[in-house]
Each structure stands twice: as structure tokens, then as C-alpha cells.
């Protein structure tokens, strides 16, 4: 996530409320095949978790998680991954 550190620092300096959207199609299809818009060469699950933890340092006032298409992943791995992302987001924001 190029530029994330600088963006978080700037938003923190301004002390503005932040709405945080996570589009799960940023994940590599090897990790998250259940999306209508797969991103070859996307980020890993651990990279996304690190980004969530970084952004959660801000004044998060709301959030959403998008782009899960469970019918495109009969294995259920994408749904499990999405649930883990939501859990980590809630834990990070509730700190």
C-alpha cells in the first residue's frame, strides 16, 4: 500500500473523522477468489491486516467491507477470509 504511511500521518495531523472502506478485491485471487473483479498480483491477507491496523490509528467513524461474491467461490475460503477481515477491522477500531 504505497503512500499509506504518509496518508495516515496527514489525516492524523488534521484530526479529521475517517470513513474506512475495504474492497476485498484488492486481495490476490490466490487468497480471495470469490470476487467479481479479481486483482492479479493483489495484496496478501497479512498485508491487508497490516494496513487495517495502520488506518485504525485514525479517528474511524464508520467502515464497510465490500466485494465478496460467495457464489464465485464454492470452497468458502473467500467468505472465511471476509469474516476474518471484518473481525480484525472491528478489533482494531475498538481499541
Language model region names:
Residues 1-95:
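Catalytic cores of soluble, metal-dependent hydrolases
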Amino acid at each position: 500500500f504505497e503512500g499509506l504511511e504518509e496518508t495516515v500521518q496527514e489525516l492524523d495531523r488534521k484530526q479529521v473523522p475517517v470513513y474506512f472502506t475495504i474492497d476485498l478485491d484488492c486481495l490476490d485471487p490466490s487468497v480471495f477468489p470469490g470476487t467479481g473483479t479479481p486483482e492479479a498480483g493483489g495484496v496478501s491477507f497479512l498485508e491487508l491486516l497490516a494496513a487495517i491496523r495502520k488506518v485504525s490509528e485514525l479517528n474511524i467513524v464508520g467502515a464497510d467491507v465490500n466485494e465478496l461474491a460467495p457464489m464465485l467461490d464454492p470452497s468458502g475460503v473467500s467468505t472465511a477470509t471476509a469474516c476474518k477481515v471484518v473481525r480484525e477491522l472491528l478489533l482494531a477500531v475498538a481499541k
